Amino acid sequence: MDKFTTLTGIAAPMPLINVDTDMIIPKQFLKTIKRSGLGANLFDEMRFDDDGNEIPDFVLNKPAYRDAQILVAGDNFGCGSSREHAPWALLDFGIRCVIATSFADIFYNNCFKNGILPIVLLQEQVDMLMDDAERGANAVVSVDLESQTITGPDGGTISFEVDAFRKHCLLNGLDDIGLTLEKAPSIKAFEAEAAQARPWV
């Protein structure tokens, strides 16, 4: 998993509430267990019409937001089924941070496990960032995980909270496998000791 330290990029505004995981990545794209390639179908039913043509008015189809790395979203983002493909699709598209007033619990947890930083802010703070994001190509926002601050286009800063353990994992690029590998010496020592104590096992 890639480390998350400081992210500076275009913020795309998506003020819709209750964006569920089926909207993020529709069910017909869940057949794969690969994490790559899902970005092409991120928000598929909002990005494309029935003939597969881009819908020009959708935010991520607009030239200013095609390379967005930050998503400023509405309340209860990521609700619905618990598909891990949802954060996979966001990450594959290039989104490393989602900012909203609230997230569905499972989606929120899955983001951290896949290298995405979900940030919960007050409504007025999200509204301010949403206004900033409306600037298009000028909507450059910086997220500093170490200092837990967001810096807007005008230089104003907003502080955010994040669990200390999850922060540690993101800063060091540690997913569940990485965390286990950190304990490899202790695991090997335990196995060696257990083999001596119970050689019949």
Swiss-Prot record:
Q: Which GO terms describe its cellular component?
A: 3-isopropylmalate dehydratase complex
**Which Enzyme Commission number(s) are on file for it?**
4.2.1.33
Enzyme class, spelled out: lyase
Q: Does the keyword Amino-acid biosynthesis apply?
A: yes
Q: What are the GO MF terms of this UniProt record?
A: 3-isopropylmalate dehydratase activity
Give the UniProt keywords, A-Z: Amino-acid biosynthesis, Branched-chain amino acid biosynthesis, Leucine biosynthesis, Lyase
User: Its Gene Ontology biological processes?
Assistant: L-leucine biosynthetic process
- Say which domain of life the source belongs to: Bacteria
**What pathway does the UniProt record associate with this protein?**
Amino-acid biosynthesis; L-leucine biosynthesis; L-leucine from 3-methyl-2-oxobutanoate: step 2/4
Its UniProt entry gives the catalysed reaction(s) as:
(2R,3S)-3-isopropylmalate = (2S)-2-isopropylmalate
So what family is this one in? Belongs to the LeuD family. LeuD type 1 subfamily.
How does this polypeptide assemble, per the annotation? Heterodimer of LeuC and LeuD.
The record's function comment reads:
Catalyzes the isomerization between 2-isopropylmalate and 3-isopropylmalate, via the formation of 2-isopropylmaleate.
Q: What is this protein called?
A: 3-isopropylmalate dehydratase small subunit
- The species is Jannaschia sp. (strain CCS1)
Q: What's the name of its gene?
A: leuD
